[in-house]
Amino acid sequence: MALKVKFFRDAAEIYAKGATGVAEGGHGFAAATMHAAGIDLRACLDEPEVIVGPGDRVCTPAGVAIEIGAAGVAGFVFSRSGLGAKDGLTVAQGVGVIDPDYRGEIKVWLLNTSHWEQKIVRGQRIAQLVLLPFFQANAAPCAELGDTDRGAGGFGHTGKM
């Protein structure tokens, strides 16, 4: 699938420097391996580092804007498993959504869920961008919904005996 990428500031250098196997003049904005589901997003900070206090959030520029070349596909920004498990830094809203018609710079809100200050350094891998299909609903108002065995039970209801 075609994916156009626009780099901001010196982001092309940051991505090329952090990637492996990038040819001279290459940009490095690609999946790390042939079977990787996502593309790592990097902290394209103006300063060398940012400190995130316990429970605090920080908006981190990823230095790129994208244009997805397929209809019905959007970008989803997920936490990196190691960053969340080791440092407690996760995508603040759970998952970020990059609508296919959005053309601005991708920014990642990171939340420090740990009890200690965490440091984000320039060029660090902070999240991953995964392209996935989506469906738009054609909502139809109604007075009643169809019956199911579950009904309106929620919040752990299906696990009860």
Stretches with model-predicted labels:
Residues 1-161:
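Non-catalytic terminal segments and appended small domains
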